Amino acid sequence: MNLTITKEQLLNGLQAVQNVVSSRTTLPILSNVLVRAENNRLEFTATDLDVTVACSVEATVKKGGATTIPVKKLFSITRELSSTEIDLEVDEKNVCSIRSGSSFYKINGLAAEEFPPINAFKDDKKVTVAQEKLKAMMKKTSFAISTDEARYVLNGIFMSLKEHKMTIVATDGRRLALTDEEVDISDKSQGEFIIPAKAVNELNRLLSDKGDVTIRYAENQAEFSLKDDKGFSVVIVTKLIEGNYPNYRQVIPAEAKERVSLPREEFLHALKRAEIMTSEKANSVKLAFGKNNLAITANSPEVGEARESIAVNYKGKEMAIAFNPKYMIDPLNALSNDEVFIELIDELSPGVLKINGPFLYVVMPMRLS
């Protein structure tokens, strides 16, 4: 294998795939990136056996071939090189020579044949959406994924492709985030599946504001193929979480008794300030709604007290409810709307956060002290 590539292209390719590589693997091959050169493209593939990321970039290929190289070493060397052009050459013993300006390095690799194979997907179940759309949907929901490994089916996002609508849901049992968008879905591509958190994190990192993403899925795997207008392409293949996702519709409260309109930014920063005065033992903030006013208080015997007041649009009865501040801050951080709405039934029933758009967030209240 022999090729010339710019430092920028080499870094782009390595940055796209290296996050999936585990530093604690017992299999040396999984610390390596598979590098394949052909047709003036250089393809990088990395995997932890659950999630695989492949990326293709432009290069001047003089002689094609494939090998595997320790990804952290290759990335660290490339990042520190001062020249913008790099020559890579790999011999029959999988030793990779790197030349750039006055720098020369050799890295010992492993044979490409040792790298785990990647399943090829058929086109039977697939849907294509704008990357920007999927990126926004992921951002609005993924913060609510459960980290409790005992509830395995909640350790990812639920994706439903039905009746020309893509619905994405995440919940940890104490809160639930849901968003949906109109999408063109053929009859044979309809279905639903659970994408694990690690693949969701990779998608959040790699989805851009341009180009499309094609989603293909089978019984236990899904593939996300990303392409932008600059010829940069990434493929993420992930195992799916097995099991039945809970019926999330039944936790969405019926019609609310009270509805309040709030300025998102002001509400967010008031909550962030109040959260400073909470503690492990007293980790709630109280929201007291009066006519066109919201009073936010946090009280912790070992820390102190916080009081905030903001103007809101509210004409209902006086009402107070308490929440874990993090569970309100997370969705407000993920949204970009100027205005948000909170719908309430009473102090013991879940609150619902909404926007003027396809998004809904249900959060369990805490006991008022």
PLM features: what roles do these ranges have?
Residues 1-369:
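Structural preference for solvent-exposed beta-strand-turn elements
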